[in-house]
Amino acid sequence: MKPYVLKFQEIRPHSEALVGGKGMNLGACSNIEGVHVPAGFCLTTEAYKRTLAENNEFTQLLQRLSSLKTSDMDAIREISETIRTLIQHTQIPSEIASYMDATLLDVGGYEMPFAVRSSATAEDLPHASFAGQHDTYLNIIGKDALLQHISMCWASLFTERAIIYRIQNQFDHRKVQLAVVIQQMISPEASGILFTADPITSNRKSLSIDASFGLGEALVSGLVSADSYTVRENTITNKIIATKKLAIYSLKEGGTETRILEKSQQTKQTLTDQQIIQLAKLGRKIEAYFGKPQDIEWCLAEGAFYIVQSRPITTLYPIPEVNEPGNRVYISVAHQQMMTDAMKPLGLSFYLMTTPATMYTAGGRLFVDITQSLSAKVSRDMMVNSLGQSDPLIKDALLTVINKKGFLPPLPTEENPSHATVSGKPPVRSIPDSSSVFELVRNSENSIKHLKQSIETKSGSDLFDFIVEDLEELKRVLFNPTSIDAIMAGMDASAWLNEHIYQWLGEKNVADKLSESAPNNITSQMGLELLDVADVIRPYPAVRAYLEQTKNPDFMNELATLEGGAETKKALEDYLQKYGMRCAGEIDLTKTRWIENPLTLIPLILSNIKNFDSGASMHKFAQGEKEAFHKEQEILRRLQELPDGEQKAMETKEKIDILRHFIGYREYPKYGMINRYFIYKLALLRAGEQLVKDGILQEQEDIYFLYFEELREVVRTGQVDYELINVRKRDFATFEKLTPPRILTSDGEMINGEYKRENLPKDAILGLPVSSGTVEGRARVILDMEKADLEDGDILVTAYTDPSWTPAFVSIKGLVTEVGGLMTHGAVIAREYGLPAVVGVENATTIIKDGQQIRINGTEGYIEILD
């Protein structure tokens, strides 16, 4: 017999598909000792399906909905209204009504007032915060009224808002069903919401309570302001008493009314201090039962607290699991690497196996525990100053943690002996020989060539042994002392030039102009060479027309039928042979590479054809060289006019030569690493394909949700835990929606820092200046490079840019990113291309709207919206 009705105490764990998120959580709360839940039951999804199962019109309407996009508003509106009317006029089968009759007798009978709440299978789940998307009805009395409101709850599954939300979150309308919670109404003196973690800072030790008089609907619907109480370790740390002009109360005959409160009550504290602590303890008990922070709806009646809902807080950033005592401080690796997307487990594995630093995972990102470095003055000062140079927001976030009273242990009165020899100054590095860049590149290319040949013969467990060995070769290449010296030589020369030329001539960031068209930069070459691909295609209108409309991932093979198709295919293949291992978010080995989906490059190629004349790559590079040379001559001439000018000019010339020789090499080690990652990926996908053939894996790309050693064990044993893979897929869907903080504490507090600058234009949007100059233009807010339809002279506004974005830089005249630092990829390439750039602009992609006219000041570090 199918369970159409379940009392709360009868609901078992993992029953989302039967009772929805709300129903399952109420069932769990009903089983917690000392927690009062108003009596009630759940009309299950089986009742929903039974009522509508044989309705052909309903089935056809669902089929129509499944093909719609969020842009199809007229169709959504029409189908929404039709479905809701249909459901409300469909009679609930008598057998379901009979089960309800019997259950209602146990929870008070039809004469009792009830709350009728929808409980969707896609609502209140850990990976999708659907709260408030479906309807709730209060103080419903009588059988007919209950049945009517049950149908109205079912119909609320198909409001326009709910339909659009499902489309956005890729939920299948045909698979989402609705259960209905029917619960005794409490007529409370007060009600509200309790968060067992601070919803603003994510601090897990701070508990937040919102409270107002009457029913909670006034608070949830935004009709009234609420008192706000903060509790930490059973101590009230903050109280804000709101003016509560209104409250909603139940009516005896059913329904609710809104009342204006007496003046004396409007400013009265809703809960006493004793009640606040009592409720906080109750919240901690519920949190402990579920094992994660909770968003709890509560009400107070006759001196007792009742819980009417509890759901996980879906917006909190996870905390790294570190078995170390005391308070800890973690710094985001994502912000240093300019890639803040969530990574899949296999991608995390390879980065962890590549880096010598100890890192921890949280929310699909990597963090480093810097607590020890902050516990001694010398290492603390070095960290704050070095990181602060490249990213002032991280510096401010670190200072915020350091200044948190009692969070970090006090500095020792005498320095730790292990730090005694540290001067606080960066070590003096030797400048490599001028031929070293050529040798480093050649050695890396030879090493990659050997890897490609050797890995082809490896399979099974031997493949994993081979990859582990080759990762040591990768680390040898990446952390070669000569390579590091070459990178630092360019960076040190840049810093020296900026500091001394500002001191001597009063000119800021002169290294930006001097870096334009520097040689040996594999990433800027990548952008310019895509212009050469555009030159090959430009004379062939049939190819251009085909590329403008094709969505076929196999388009390369179709080119052969077109005039110029063979030439186009060869140009693309040559480009992909050199750069095809790159993509957005490329440090995650699991990301789709350009060579795996060449369609990604087509919008940029078409933009290049539209925006540039033939030969633009040579012209742009030569123009950059010319401007850098003229700036060099100007600086040297002005220096020679100063006291001791010949000496200053000689020193400056030496630094300019070092800058131009070495600054481009900085991009090469990552290019080599990504090359290797792609070779590993292809080999592991072959292993995944074999696992699918052997019936062990369902899909080849399921390997992405296993860590390297786990995948190695699956290959060795032929056994896999699919529940683990499915959990990680759900977790990843959650992690994708989270924004990682720059600094995270062991309390879960997210600290992102603030800019502290004065004398800027009113309403200026602050960021970090990384490439000098001021420019005005149309903002193009682009989050996906595949949609980069850029016009010559646009200003690119995006979340971050890694090397894969470089081809877009040839079309733009300015850059704004949410993440970045002085020496991160976007900054380096912007300087080489001569583009004014401001990075580290918090929420830039939401504050700035696509198409707005903006002005960016890459010298002072701010943006102005002009319209």
Curated annotation (Swiss-Prot):
Ligase as UniProt keyword: no
Pfam families: PEP-utilizers, PPDK_N
Region (ATP-binding): 1-314
Protein's GO biological process: response to antibiotic
Keywords: Antibiotic resistance, ATP-binding, Kinase, Nucleotide-binding, Transferase
Reaction equation(s) it catalyzes: rifampicin + ATP + H2O = 21-phosphorifampicin + AMP + phosphate + 2 H(+)
Superkingdom per UniProt: Bacteria
Effect of residue 479 to A: Has only minor effects on RIF-phosphorylation activity
Protein EC: 2.7.9.6
Enzyme kind, highest EC tier: transferase
Entry keyword annotation includes GTP-binding: no
Region Swivel phosphohistidine, annotated ranges: 767-865
Span list, region Rifampicin-binding: 327-754
UniProt remark on domains: Contains three domains: an N-terminal ATP-binding domain, a large central rifampicin (RIF)-binding domain and a small C-terminal swivel phosphohistidine domain that harbors the conserved histidine residue essential for phosphate transfer. RIF modification involves a two-stage mechanism: the first reaction, which takes place in the ATP-binding domain, involves attack of the ATP by His-825 of the swivel phosphohistidine domain, forming a pyrophosphorylated histidine residue. This reaction is followed by transit of the swivel phosphohistidine domain to the RIF-binding domain.
PANTHER family with a match to the protein in the record: PHOSPHOENOLPYRUVATE SYNTHASE-RELATED, PPDK_N DOMAIN-CONTAINING PROTEIN
Its biological purpose: Catalyzes the phosphorylation of rifampicin, also known as rifampin (RIF), leading to its inactivation. Confers high level resistance to a variety of clinically used rifamycin antibiotics. Does not show phosphoenolpyruvate (PEP) synthase activity.
Entry's family note: Belongs to the rifampicin phosphotransferase family.
Record protein name field: Rifampicin phosphotransferase
Species for this entry: Listeria monocytogenes serotype 4b (strain F2365)
Gene giving rise to this polypeptide: rph
